[in-house]
Amino acid sequence: MRVKVTLACTECKRRNYNTMKNKKNDPDRLEMNKYCPHCHKHAAHKETK
């Protein structure tokens, strides 16, 4: 089952991206390196509630 998740920057804590994930394949929280427009750099983004 695919669900919507929100990704938040680990440095400034702002929620920048929405994406979908498959809970069966990724039961843990996602973490991706993406560009943060508020920090003006690439930073790790973690899945939030």
From Swiss-Prot:
Q: Does the keyword Metal-binding apply?
A: no
Q: Record's GO cellular component, any one?
A: ribonucleoprotein complex
Q: Where are the transmembrane segments?
A: none
| Molecular function per GO | structural constituent of ribosome
| InterPro entries to which the protein is assigned, alphabetical | Ribosomal_bL33 (IPR001705), Ribosomal_bL33_CS (IPR018264), Ribosomal_bL33_sf (IPR038584), Ribosomal_zn-bd (IPR011332)
- Cystine bridges: none
> What's a Pfam family this protein contains?
Ribosomal_L33
Set out the biological process GO terms recorded for this chain's protein.
Answer: translation
Top-level taxon of the source organism: Bacteria
Secretion signal: which residues? none
The answer, when asked if Ribosomal protein is one of the entry's keywords, is yes
Keywords of this entry? Ribonucleoprotein, Ribosomal protein
Family stated for the protein in its record: Belongs to the bacterial ribosomal protein bL33 family.
What protein am I looking at? Large ribosomal subunit protein bL33
The record lists the lineage as: Bacteria, Bacillati, Bacillota, Clostridia, Eubacteriales
The encoding gene = rpmG
